[in-house]
Structure formats: C-alpha cells, structure tokens
Amino acid sequence: MTAAQKETLGFQTEVKQLLNLMIHSLYSNKEIFLRELVSNASDAADKLRFLALSQGDLYQGDADLRVRISADKEANTITISDNGIGMTRDEVISSLGTIAKSGTAEFFKNLTGDQSKDSQLIGQFGVGFYSAFIVADLVTVRTRKAGETTAYEWESQGEGEYTLQEIEKEGRGTDIILHLREEEKEFADEWRLRSIVTKYSDHISTPVQMYKAEVPESEGEDGEKIPAVPGEWESINRATALWTRDKSELSDDEYKEFYKHVSLDWEDPLSWAHNKVEGKTEYTSLLYIPKKAPFDLWNRDRQSGLKLYVQRVFIMDDAEQFMPSYLRFVKGLLDSNDLPLNVSREILQDNKVTQAIRKGCTSRIIKMLERMAKNKADDYQVFWNEFGQVIKEGPAEDAANKEAICKLLRFSSTHTDSATQDVSLEQYVERMNEGQEKIYYVVADTFTAAKNSPHLEIFRKKGIEVLLLSDRVDEWMMSHLTEFADKQLQSITRGDLDLGKLDDEETKKAQEESEKEVAGLVERIKTALGDEVKEVRFTHRLTDSPACVVSDDNDMSSQMQKLMESVGQAAPEAKPVFELNPEHQLVKHLNDEQDEDKFAQWSHVLLDQALLAERGTLKDPTGFVTRLNKLMLELSK
C-alpha cells in the first residue's frame, strides 16, 4: 500500500464523544497521559512475553522487552516506543478507532455535564490511548505485529476521522508520536518526563528507558583527562514487580499508584492487602478495595476478576475464578508458583490450586472489611454506600463464610429512622428488648415506604426495633438469611404476628374484647371479597390503620414477586391475607353497615388501600377510583 493508498476512516460515534469529553474534562490532570501510554506499552510487553512461552521465535532475537520515551523540543514531540506484541491492521482499527467494550452505553448515560464528576467516570471507564489527545493535536501510531512483516501507520487529529496506511518498520512493537499542542510544550522536556514516570510508573515491571546523552571527554581539576562516557538508554523506573518486594519497603503512595495501573481507576483505593502465602499452595496476592463503584457494576457482561501472573509472567486479565461474584468489585493481582505457565480459563475452572487461592483471597477480603468496620467506621460506611448491595448477595452465594458476611451487613432501622444503612445485626441484637426472641424486619420498595409501613405500628408502640429494607436485592437476600446469633429473622409482613413474651395478658384480653364487638365481620368481608384474598382475619399489629395485607408463610412475598417480574420471570400468583384492626373506627362503622352493596364497596376500598400501602400498585386502579368516588359522593349528600 503506497502513500497514495492511504485510507481515511471515520471514528465510531462513541470515540468522538469520548475525545471531546477528555479534552474538556481532564485538562486539570494532563500529565496522566504518560501514565496511560506507558501502562499500555507495558501491557504489550506482557502479552508478548506470554505468547513467547509457546512461540519463542516471536522474539526474533530481541527478548529484552522495554518501553522507551524520547522528546524533541524543536519538533515539539514526544515518542513512546515499545518492542511488545504490536498490532495488525484489524487490531489497529478495533483498538484505536472503536470502543469495543461492554458498558459503553451505560458510561455515556451516566455522564452529568459536571466536569469533576465526569472526569471520575472517564477514569473508571479507562481511556488508555485516547488520553494522548489531552496534550496532542496530532497523534501518529506506527506498529508491527510480532511475527508479521507488514507494519501500519495510524494518524489522527482527534476529531472525526483518522488515516491508515501500510509502512515499512524495522522491528516489532508500537511507536506513538505525540505532536504537542503549542500550550503543552512543557512536556517536551526530558526532566519533566522523567519526573512523571517516577511519580506514576515506577512500579511498572517492564523497564521504562530514556536516553542519557554522551558525556564528552574532559579535564579534571588537576589536569587529568576524564574519559568520555558514551550515551545509552537507561532505566528510569525500578522495573521490578512491585508485589515481589517486601511490604516494609513499600510506601502507601507506591501501593496507590500500582492500584491505578492494575485497575485503570484514577482515584486512590479505599484499602488494600498484600500477602505472600507459603506452604502447600504458594502465591502472592495484592488485593484492593476501590473507593467508588464502577458505573457498570450491575452489567451482566462486565468483565471482572484479578490479573493473573504465574512465576511473575503475566497470563491473563480478569481471571474471575479467584473471587466469588459478591466480591466482583475487588481489584488486584495474583502471582502463583503452582499453576502451569500454559494455564487457560478452562484449566482454572476445576483446579485444586485455584480453589485454594480463591478460598484464601475471599477470607482475606472479608477480614480486611471486618477490620475496616471495626477500626475505620467512616471508611466502612463509604464502602457500604458503594458496594453494600453487592455484599448482600453473599449469604446466598457463600455458605462457608455466611456468618462472617452477615456481620458485615448494614441496614436502615427504626432505631435511627434514617435512610443511611449503618445498623449491623450485632448492634440490633445488643439492643433487643427483654423477652424479645426474634430480629424483625420489613421489606418495601423505598425507605420511605418501609418507614411508613402500617405493619410497624405495634412495634413502634412497644418500642421494638425493626430493620427497614428497601434495596432491590433485600427480599432475595432475606430468603437465605433466616438466623443470626441464634435469633430467627422474621418479616413483619408475613404470617400471623406473634410477639411471644412481648405481649402481656392484659393486652391480649383487651384485644379479645374488641374482636367480640365486631364478631361476624370477618365472614361478611370474606363473602364480599370472594377469591381476591386467601384469608380474612383480625390483627393486633395495627394501631392507627384500619387494615393491612400480609403474605402467607408458605407463599411468595409481594416484594419477591416484584423482583421476579422485574427480571422477566413469571411469579406464581399468591393471594394476600387481609387483616383488620378491630379497634379502628372505620372497621367498627363497616360492621354497622347494613346495606350489603355499600358494605362490599367499602370492603374493596379497604383492601385496595392496604394493597397500595404494601405494594405501591393496584391491578385495577380505575376500579378503585370509581368505587372511592361513588362512596365519597354518597357521603357528601
């Protein structure tokens, strides 16, 4: 392909949006472009090293992998070169012309227009190569794939299109030439570049080199000749795998910068754990808990997992086999001495070494969270606000660690009456009333709906704390969380209410008397409502409301039905149990109503009100409005 055959291709729409966003949102942190490009170059070296394990000829006599940075002040350019894996034509187009990653639509949907918030999102998304356009108005990429003879040149001004052509290139790998904007000349200074590499990329295991100019022959103070020192490429980073170094010699800043390298996050992590395990299974783990949840945490196609190394050789990204799904937010890496270098995802799936490492890493994260909850409550609250809903998947997924996970759970509660989820099950148990045998909770669509649930009335009256649950995952979680500290967890919206020792004899007698006053009402309402309800009965869980609906112990709760329907699954129909407050004036008036038509209308209105309070929706809202209007019209006469 000659220069005349240069192709002009258009960027994918999302790339254009991303480039525009970066230039306007990331100008306050421009120097990160070098971190991103050096990180990419190091990854290219890692990938070649892995492939060369089985295809040694890919090295072509050049096995010393490195990244080189040079600056030309006169031309106002920076060049970042690597002798890593390189790219084919198709890989150039897919890597530099499109964003081929899941969650792209979610990313753009989450943008707010607030530059500080958007810059955080861009960091989570991982811009990599495109960060070059923060400082450059023209970027040239020359690349040759290892094992191939054809090379390609990609060039763009970061606007709507790019050019692509075949070129001659001596060695494999990729050269990225940044033609700096006039106002970004400071980055064409070698000392400036060295300081950025030291700041952000000291931990990169691939040597990052810059050219040290020749020192000519000179004379010393006593007239002796000092021989010339030839120019050479010298490493300006440590070029040792950070995780292989002793914890005692690593600073917090080094751990934080390494986190940004492995996670593509731009924020500091919340916490981390660095461990070397010896014995039957030998491995090193460096695990991080992020400060912010990624925007695509709930995307089913999202890739998660740890970077996997075997004997310090990079094997794969996103090795999900080492963490349970409820810890999918954890970032970091594993370096195993026991796995084979030719390990595949299939081999990892049913491997005893994998299972031992997974068990150890899971335990380590749980202990890290336990320490944080105990010693750094504010940090733990930050963590819970971001990742609490994911942790709530734990009791169902991980029976072996269920008790420990339960101690990490946090809830809203009537004790605080705040939407903030900061009450632990241990705190609840410590505050339980004398004679209280169960941990009570209510599940609703929102915190406000839970807080105002009529089912809470008797509990507020008696001063019994109730956990207020309103996350989408809560009903499913509670179906797997039935006991804690030998106390049964009881939904206050299921089954007949039994407060056990918390009910005194005097109260029970008063309740029985109030039921006698409206004897026969239950049967009349059963007849009026027919098969709309499973059962009608009196209750003493209410103090201010006339009626409520509850789920039978053996039926699926209304919240679980909603959850199943929201994910497209058919939920078995479960009719509610309709409960009446015999002490409420409306119920007494209903008992006195002799007109059976009006009686039926009022019965339906009471049921619909109770269903609205419990579920927030009605199957027939028009029928409810019609009945209510009719009754109000009659009352106004």
From Swiss-Prot:
InterPro entries reported in the protein's UniProt record: HATPase_C_sf (IPR036890), Heat_shock_protein_90_CS (IPR019805), HSP90_C (IPR037196), Hsp90_fam (IPR001404), Hsp90_N (IPR020575), Ribosomal_Su5_D2-typ_SF (IPR020568)
Keyword Chaperone: yes
Region annotation (B) ranges: 346-562
Region (A): 1-345
Keywords: ATP-binding, Chaperone, Cytoplasm, Nucleotide-binding, Stress response
Region span, C: 563-637
Protein location: Cytoplasm
Coiled-coil ranges per UniProt: none
GO molecular function: ATP binding; ATP hydrolysis activity; ATP-dependent protein folding chaperone; unfolded protein binding
Primary localization: cytoplasm
Gene3D superfamilies (alphabetical): 3.30.230.80, 3.40.50.11260, Heat shock protein 90, C-terminal domain, Histidine kinase-like ATPase, C-terminal domain
A single cellular component GO annotation: cytoplasm
Record-linked HAMAP family: HSP90
Family matches, as PANTHER family: HEAT SHOCK PROTEIN 90 FAMILY MEMBER
Subunit relationships: Homodimer.
Function: Molecular chaperone. Has ATPase activity.
NCBIfam families (UniProt xref): PRK05218.1
Family: Belongs to the heat shock protein 90 family.
The name this protein goes by in its record: Chaperone protein HtpG
Organism: Pseudoalteromonas translucida (strain TAC 125)
Lineage: Bacteria, Pseudomonadati, Pseudomonadota, Gammaproteobacteria, Alteromonadales
